[in-house]
Amino acid sequence: YGMDMQKAEEKDVNTYPTPDELWEMTFGEADSINQDAGEWRDKFHKTPFETRSGTWQPRYYQENAISNALDAISKGQNRILLTLATGTGKTAIAFQIVWKLFHSKWNLRKDGQQLPRILFLADRNILADQAFNAFSAFEEDALVRIRPSEIRKKGKVPTNGSIFFTIFQTFMSGRDENGNP
């Protein structure tokens, strides 16, 4: 009797499959479809964690969250939701995901030639500032803190970095079709 957990199928089996048949049943289709995904997954996993000179190591659940998010990204998933309780290190998890994306040069073109552009969106300025400070291991010119007041002054959104930090309200700082703020 055999069960395919991915296809949710069950059926009688007359003979045991050979190791090669098992491999093909398990990974064959996925290998041909997700070869690119496998290459990106390998790049992500080869990029070491930023450990702050050995003073920080991810907890097991943080490592699982980072790994699962990067696997989903490598497979081309556009929406990924991580839900964790207060005090579990969501900012540290986000930092490590961004660290690996940045250093593997992952981007939407998936060409590995250009640094990614990443938006860290928070609901309060204090959280955006906290995240901006937590990302201090990155080169200074990679980080940009976007404030609504700066957009109003300059009339445009800064584009001179790779990792941008702001709050939701920043997107409401422009003018409507009538020119009203």
Describe the residue ranges of each PLM region.
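ATP-dependent helicase/translocase motor core
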Residues: Y1-R117, I126, Q130-D141, T159-I163, ...
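Conserved motor-coupling elements within RecA-like helicase/translocase cores
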Residues: S149-F164
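Short, solvent-exposed loop/turn elements at domain surfaces
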Residues: S173-R175
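Short beta-strand/turn micro-motifs composed of small residues
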Residues: A122
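Acidic/polar loop patches that form or flank catalytic/metal-binding clefts of enzymes
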Residues: D141-R147
